[in-house]
Amino acid sequence: MLAPTAAVNVTNEGENDNVMIDTTRGEIEFSDSAVNGTMDIEGAPKFAPAKTSAEKKRGAKPQMRRVPIPPHRMTPLRNVWPKLYPPLVEHLLLQVRMNTKSRSVELRESKATKDPGALQKGMDFVQAFALGFDIDDAIALLRLDDLYIDTFEIKDVKTLQGDHLSRAIGRIAGQGGKTKFAIENASRTRIVLADSKIHILGGFTNIRIAKDAVVSLILGSPPGKVYANLRNAAARAKERI
């Protein structure tokens, strides 16, 4: 293997190739467009100091995200707007506006934005509200890093139509929302029933506990049995902690 600093000249004369290797040069300077540094004869690279994230952002165009809002959530959005935008502006230091024409919330980085993940956190917060979560529950996504949203449909568990689908949704909700509240309290999650879609907000382990309970109800398990399994799973999770 040739040394990285060797200069190689190849000339073709007839059928023979004459290769001349010049080893008199001890160091090669690379152009700024390449690696912006030098490499000595021993192969040890010498690079310029890496730019900090602040230096990279300086002069760069601010990033922007647009979160679509379903039509049925536009009125609730207007009602809670004075409560929704302060965490985005004061905590994440983002620029935010409600675009009623495109039915969306637009987020953009500002010069004061320091957290590189602020834009993504803001999107998760607004998306959680758009999915149907209460504003006080969605704001937990800004305060805690280990919270997620898991979404699935009833047909992903079992193919149901008509009255069978309605009964499955009724089993998950329970009379007056009793079953849903019991699952939320036992698993420390928040659940939104949006027609045949189910959204669960919580930690990874807690989401799994709540999802197992919801799946059991969809498959037809009696609520009493689901409650017992839910209590056992919650107790085991508490022991691990």
From Swiss-Prot:
- Name which cysteines form disulfide bonds: none
**UniProt record, GO biological process:** rRNA processing
Query: What Pfam family is a match for this entry?
Result: KH_PNO1_2nd
What is the protein's major site of localization? cytoplasm
All copies of domain KH, residue ranges: 162-214
Question: Is NAD given among the entry's keywords?
Answer: no
State the residue spans of region: Disordered.
48-71
Q: Which UniProt keywords apply?
A: Cytoplasm, Nucleus, Phosphoprotein, Ribosome biogenesis, RNA-binding
What GO CC terms are in its UniProt record?
cytosol; nucleolus; nucleus
Q: Where in the cell is it found?
A: Cytoplasm; Nucleus; Nucleus, Nucleolus
Task: Give residues where Phosphothreonine occurs.
Answer: T52
Q: Which domain of life does the UniProt lineage start with? A: Eukaryota
Q: Which GO terms describe its molecular function?
A: RNA binding
Assembly mode = Component of the small ribosomal subunit, ribosomal RNA processing complex (SSU RRP complex).
Function of the molecule: Required for small ribosomal subunit (SSU) synthesis. Has a role in the processing of early nucleolar and late cytoplasmic pre-RNA species.
Instruction: Identify its protein family.
Output: Belongs to the PNO1 family.
Q: Report the protein name in the record.
A: Pre-rRNA-processing protein pno1
- Native source organism of the sequence: Schizosaccharomyces pombe (strain 972 / ATCC 24843)
